Each structure stands twice: as structure tokens, then as C-alpha cells.
From Swiss-Prot:
InterPro entries: Chst-1-like, Sulfotransferase. One of its GO terms (molecular function) is chondroitin 4-sulfotransferase activity. Pfam families: Sulfotransfer_2. This is Putative sulfotransferase vep-2. It comes from Caenorhabditis elegans.
Length: 321
């Protein structure tokens, strides 16, 4: 005669357990940091990415590291006057680093520069090198950050090496050389947040010039490095140098500036950058399906190491105002 009561109690226990599990699952889902890509919400791929997101939101640590008074600014001085002394400014015309990605099929060459969509453009040029192989691999352009699908296949370190490999004339030809350029301040803030905030400080003496989260310290030390390398008093280069040295030092622009077409970087690529790139792709007779694939990657998918719009980016940009 106790069976109905026992059954009811058993059912109640099961319902309580299910409800508890549901609450735990919902709580875990809500508590996970997420990254937004257009209207899609995507959880971080790894625990490392979750830790990176936490660092990008840790404003208390950033404020504490930058609580000092900024050095006084020079007023009423033009860039021309400021750089009139040889040892004050770095030379404009200097070769530092060139990383070219080639699509022989469409006679396209793109020079990638760190913090100017280098990962995404590396993916785009690899896709144009062999659309079928890239599509069949199931990769996205963001995957190029960790492993390059076209490593040692379509990569060159000088414009002359590309010319020699494909017998390209030294005058204007049907080959298209391009480079994405970015506002220097925007590029600096993005690079600083990427290298000095997002990435865990594993080497306190070397990484970010040993300055941690202190941007003023970093700028002063990187300026010293820039001047030392400018006048060949120092030859050792760091990842920081690659991310912060002038864009015009890249891509052999000191000798081949007139051969390049420039695409203006934008945090909203749909408004400026993509129309320019699409016009170039059409000019080089890239099929509409391939253009659509590239647009989808560039417009609706975000690089996993992008720092745009994060509290860290907003804070460090405010230090300029």
C-alpha cells in the first residue's frame, strides 16, 4: 500500500536532480566568456582564449600600471621641425621586413604587415593560391594565425624574388601588388593591446620591453630601439619591433613604392576596405564564387586575436587624448 507514495517520492527525486543539472548547465553556459561575430555568439575555442579575454577586461590592473602622470607634451612644433635633427626621428626610407603572399593564378601579390589584417590576408592569398585545396581543408582564414596552410608555397621575402620567380617586368604589368595600410595610432594601440595585454607576460624582462602593462614605459623603450636599429647600433629584432616599426619600412617600399596599390584598413571592412579589395579581385578576374568566399571570411568572421572594441583598447586609446 506504500507503492504509490514511494513512486511519487522517486519521481520527485528524479525531477529535482534533472532541475539541478539544468541549472548547473545554464549557469556554466552563461558564465563562459564569449566572442561576438556579427549576430553569432561563439564560445572561445580554448581555455587560453578565455584567459586572454579576462586580461582584456582587467581594467584595474591597467589603470594601476598607468597611474603615473604623463610626460609633458611639446606644443606648437611641426613634424618637420621636430625631425629636423637627424637623431630625433627615424629615417623614412628604410628596409626592415617584407612578407609577400602570391597567387600566380590571378597574378596577385599581397604584402602582409603585422596588425594590418595580416592573418586574414595570409588566408585570403593562400585561398587564391589553390581554392579547391583550401576549401577542402575546412579551414578558416583565422586558422592561419597558428599554422599557415601555404607555408613555403606562395611566400617570398622580397619583391625581386617574386619578379625572378614569375618573370615579372620592372615596369607596370598586369600583375597586382597590394598592401593594407592602417592609421598608425590605431595600429599601435591594437598592437600594444595584442602583445602586452592579451598575451600572458611569460618573459617579464623581454616581452613588451620589460614594461608589463605600462604603455609610457613601452613607448619610450621602443623608441630607443627604433633609433638604435635606424642607425645600425643594434641588429637584434623582436616580435615587438615587427608589430610597431613603421609600415613604410615593410614590403620593399623604399625601392618599389610605385608598384603597389594600397587598401585602407577599417575596423568596419564593409565600408571602405572590402569595396577596394573586391574591385582589385574583379580586375584580376577572380571568379565571383571565390570573391564571395573571401568576403564571407573577412566580413563575418573575426580574427581570434583581434582587440578592437575591448575595454583594454578603449583605455589605452584614451591615454592619447
Amino acid at each position: 500500500m506504500f507503492a504509490p507514495h514511494t513512486n511519487i517520492m522517486s519521481i520527485a527525486r528524479v525531477l529535482i536532480i534533472i532541475a539541478s543539472i539544468s541549472v548547473i548547465c545554464i549557469t556554466l553556459f552563461i558564465s563562459r566568456p564569449v566572442t561576438r561575430e556579427s549576430s553569432i555568439i561563439i564560445a572561445p575555442k580554448t581555455r587560453d582564449m578565455r584567459a586572454e579575454q579576462i586580461r582584456l577586461f582587467a581594467l584595474n590592473a591597467m589603470v594601476k600600471a598607468n597611474s603615473h602622470t604623463l610626460p609633458p607634451r611639446s606644443k606648437n612644433i611641426s613634424a618637420k621641425n621636430l625631425c629636423s635633427r637627424r637623431m630625433t626621428c627615424a629615417p623614412h626610407n628604410r628596409r626592415y621586413e617584407t612578407m609577400l603572399k602570391v597567387s600566380p593564378k590571378y597574378k596577385m601579390v599581397n604584402c602582409v604587415v603585422q596588425k594590418s589584417m595580416s592573418t586574414m590576408m595570409t588566408g585570403a592569398m593562400c585561398y587564391l593560391y589553390d581554392e579547391k585545396a583550401y576549401a577542402d581543408s575546412g579551414r578558416t582564414f583565422d586558422d592561419e594565425f597558428s599554422t599557415r596552410f601555404c607555408k613555403n608555397k606562395n611566400e617570398f621575402s622580397s619583391v625581386n624574388a617574386v619578379r625572378d620567380a614569375y618573370n615579372i617586368s620592372f615596369v607596370k604589368t598586369d600583375w597586382l601588388f597590394s598592401m593594407i595600410t592602417r592609421d598608425p595610432i590605431d595600429r599601435f594601440v591594437s598592437g600594444y593591446v595584442d602583445r602586452c595585454v592579451r598575451i600572458s607576460q611569460k618573459n617579464e624582462t623581454g616581452q613588451c620591453n620589460g614594461c608589463g602593462l605600462n604603455m609610457t614605459c613601452f613607448i619610450e623603450n621602443e623608441y630607443k630601439r627604433l633609433m638604435e636599429i635606424s642607425f645600425k647600433r643594434k641588429t637584434h629584432r623582436t616580435m615587438e619591433d615587427a608589430h610597431f616599426f613603421p609600415q613604410i619600412w615593410h614590403c620593399d617600399l623604399n625601392e618599389d613604392l610605385e608598384f603597389f596599390e594600397f587598401i585602407q584598413y577599417s575596423n568596419n571592412p564593409e565600408t571602405t576596405m572590402m569595396p577596394q579589395l573586391e574591385e582589385m579581385l574583379k580586375r584580376q578576374k577572380v571568379p565571383s564564387d571565390s570573391i564571395r568566399f573571401i568576403k564571407n571570411e573577412l566580413l563575418y568572421k573575426k580574427s581570434s586575436h583581434s582587440t578592437t572594441g575591448t575595454p583594454a583598447s578603449r583605455f589605452y586609446r584614451s591615454r592619447y587624448s
